[in-house]
């Protein structure tokens, strides 16, 4: 089998596993909390999965020389306009949650424009960086900073639209990481990368300390982390460093219990306990904890192996491509998938604060699934282009 066929098969297998877990982990939530039919979330995710696989296959057949840029700019501008437009829509079409509007209701389907904007932003970076950093000869840090200034304005606008209007710092962290690493892949120096990371860290600290909600999340994270870290220290030193009266991290605590209950081989599909009201939305952001409980450590390893294979295959395709914008886009897709997985996994494990990022292909959510299928479909079209 060729690389692109392996990639299509790998993505389809992850999608199948995601649909399977959307049923196994959502039954309690569906029936008890929302009073829907038992198969409500399963059917919605199954429909999204079928649509996603069809879209992925269809995009793999298009000629990127004609359609890549058109689709990329479409995914950049249309979701941006929708994110702005959501705040002018009535509650019946775009309901508020925590002071933010993130979904547009379209009858049976709810659309999250940000998921598609992430693909459009990755395209924009690949298209633009190939015309600036890649096209230029090696420059000093000052010249690199001057070249980077327009990107900083674009990112600030994105941060306002997503981080402020949608109150979603996690997505900004993800997109900022993609921007910083793609700069290195496009020829930016390590010094520039260090300056950008330092600036991003300072801005992140400012964003956290000015939000009570984010401060609480940070406290929840440290509450769990200090309990783990201080077991390695002598009792006197641990007691001196420990900050008392911190709230317990509800999500991470039960996620840890789920992983402990799963052991090596798991409780069995559908037999997990964490979904029974302990973490009612386990089929979304905490899906890895649900998989660990029902499939065990080995089942979780299988998922990570599939993601690793997918990343290697996309890198192989990127290495074959001669046009920088195509190869940079493939690298950007790897970064989106890889960083989303790592940030989510570290959040579930208590290493990072919980950010609310979905696990690509596995977490429940039609918009996230379709957006990732579009990304893989575009990569497959580029792989086919290298043959023709």
Swiss-Prot record:
The keyword Ribosomal protein does not apply. Coiled coil: none annotated. It is found in: Cell inner membrane. It catalyses: [GlcNAc-(1->4)-Mur2Ac(oyl-L-Ala-gamma-D-Glu-L-Lys-D-Ala-D-Ala)](n)-di-trans,octa-cis-undecaprenyl diphosphate + beta-D-GlcNAc-(1->4)-Mur2Ac(oyl-L-Ala-gamma-D-Glu-L-Lys-D-Ala-D-Ala)-di-trans,octa-cis-undecaprenyl diphosphate = [GlcNAc-(1->4)-Mur2Ac(oyl-L-Ala-gamma-D-Glu-L-Lys-D-Ala-D-Ala)](n+1)-di-trans,octa-cis-undecaprenyl diphosphate + di-trans,octa-cis-undecaprenyl diphosphate + H(+). Disulfide bonds: none annotated. Its EC number is 2.4.99.28. Pathway: Cell wall biogenesis; peptidoglycan biosynthesis. Keywords: Cell cycle, Cell division, Cell inner membrane, Cell membrane, Cell shape, Cell wall biogenesis/degradation, Glycosyltransferase, Membrane, Peptidoglycan synthesis, Transferase, Transmembrane, Transmembrane helix. One of its GO terms (biological process) is peptidoglycan biosynthetic process. GO terms for molecular function: lipid-linked peptidoglycan transporter activity; peptidoglycan glycosyltransferase activity. The chain crosses the membrane at residues 7-27, 39-59, 71-91, 106-126, 145-165, 169-186, 188-210, 295-315, 328-348, 359-379. It is a multi-pass membrane protein. The keyword Cell cycle applies. It comes from the Bacteria. Pfam families: FTSW_RODA_SPOVE (PF01098). Residues 1-6, 60-70, 127-144, 187, 316-327, 380-388 are cytoplasmic. Residues 28-38, 92-105, 166-168, 211-294, 349-358 are periplasmic. GO terms for cellular component: cell division site; plasma membrane. Belongs to the SEDS family. FtsW subfamily. Peptidoglycan polymerase that is essential for cell division. This is Probable peptidoglycan glycosyltransferase FtsW. It comes from Helicobacter pylori (strain J99 / ATCC 700824) (Campylobacter pylori J99). The gene is ftsW.
């Amino acid at each position: 089998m060729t690389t692109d066929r392996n990639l299509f098969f790998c993505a389809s297998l992850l999608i199948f596993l995601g649909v399977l877990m959307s049923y196994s982990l959502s039954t309690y939530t569906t029936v008890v909390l929302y009073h829907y039919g038992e198969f409500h979330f399963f059917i919605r995710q199954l429909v999204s999965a079928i649509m996603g696989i069809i879209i992925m296959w269809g995009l793999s057949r298009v000629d990127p020389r004609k359609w890549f840029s058109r689709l990329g700019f479409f995914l950049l501008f249309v979701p941006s306009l929708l994110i702005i437009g959501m705040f002018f829509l009535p509650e019946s079409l775009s309901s508020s949650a925590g002071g933010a509007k993130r979904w547009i209701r379209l009858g049976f389907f709810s659309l999250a424009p940000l998921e598609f904007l992430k693909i459009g932003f990755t395209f924009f970076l690949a298209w633009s960086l190939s015309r600036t950093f890649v096209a230029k000869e090696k420059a000093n840090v000052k010249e690199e900073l001057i070249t980077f200034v327009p990107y900083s304005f674009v990112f600030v606008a994105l941060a306002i639209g997503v981080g402020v209007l949608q109150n979603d710092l996690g997505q900004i962290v993800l997109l900022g990481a993609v921007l910083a690493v793609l700069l290195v892949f496009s020829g930016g120096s390590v010094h520039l990368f260090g300056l950008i990371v330092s600036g991003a860290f300072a801005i992140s600290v400012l964003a956290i300390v000015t939000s009570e909600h984010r401060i609480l999340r940070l406290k929840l994270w440290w509450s769990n982390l200090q309990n783990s870290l201080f077991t390695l220290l002598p009792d006197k030193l641990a007691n001196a460093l420990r900050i008392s009266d911190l709230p317990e991290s509800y999500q991470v605590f039960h996620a840890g219990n789920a992983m402990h209950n799963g052991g090596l081989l798991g409780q069995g599909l559908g037999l997990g306990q964490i979904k029974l009201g302990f973490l009612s939305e386990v089929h979304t952001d905490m899906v890895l904890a649900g998989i660990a409980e029902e499939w065990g450590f080995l089942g979780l390893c299988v998922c990570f192996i599939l993601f690793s294979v997918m990343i290697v295959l996309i890198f192989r395709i990127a290495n074959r491509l001669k046009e920088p914008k195509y190869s940079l886009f493939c690298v950007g897709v790897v970064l989106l998938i890889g960083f989303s997985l790592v940030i989510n996994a570290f959040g579930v494990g208590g290493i990072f604060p919980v950010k609310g990022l979905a696990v690509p292909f596995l977490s429940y959510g039609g918009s996230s699934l379709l957006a990732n299928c579009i990304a893989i479909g575009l990569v497959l079209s580029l792989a086919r282009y290298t043959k023709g």
